[in-house]
Amino acid sequence: MFEAIYAGAESGGATPPWDYGAPRPQFVEWAEARSLAGGGHAALVVGCGYGADAEFLARLGFRTTGFDFAPTAIAAARRKYPASEVDYHVADVLDLPGEWQGRFDLVVESLTVQSMPPEQHAAATRSIGALVAPGGTLLVLATTRDEESELTGPPWPLTRAEIEQFADGDLILGRVERIEGGAWWRAELSRPGEGPTSSP
C-alpha cells in the first residue's frame, strides 16, 4: 500500500496524506521544549518517508538513521537531500536488522504503527522498542482512539492501552499527553541504564 501511494505521488498524484513537507510540528514542539541537542548521539526515525524528521534530527547534531518500507520514499529522500548525513534504508518494521537492536539513543515513531493492521500493532511496538539503547528515549506520536470507538481504517488510531504496549520489557512509560485538542498522543518512554553515550 505505502509503495503504491509514494509511487503515485512520484507520477504526479496526490502527496501522501501523512507528509507535511516539513518536520512534524508535534515533534518539533517536543524537541524545542527540551532544547534537544544531538551531541553525536545516535537517533532513528521509524517510517521516515521523505526524510523531513530525520533531517531535522541531523541538523540538531544527531547521527541519524531513517528507514521506510517504501523504496520510492527512500529514493525520493536521497534525491531531496543529496548532501544529507542521514543514513537512509529500506526496511520493514516487523523485520529490522539485528544490529539495530539496542543501538539508538533516541527513536522517533510517528504514525507508523497506526498505519498497520491492528493485528500487527503489538509486534510492531515490540520491534520499535527493541531499538532503544540503554539510557535512551522513545518518542511516540499517534492519533487517538477511545477504547469504545469503532475500529475502522486505515489508519487505525491508537488507544491508551496500545500506547502502553510500547512499555515492553524494561522500557518505562513516562509522560503521556493528549495534544491537539485531544486528537493526538505524544508519549515518551525510556530504557534504564547507561549506553555508550548518555541520553539526549
What are these model-derived regions, one by one?
Residues L111-S115:
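Short catalytic micro-motifs in class I SAM-dependent methyltransferases
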Residues V108:
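A conserved beta-strand element that flanks and buttresses the S-adenosyl-L-methionine
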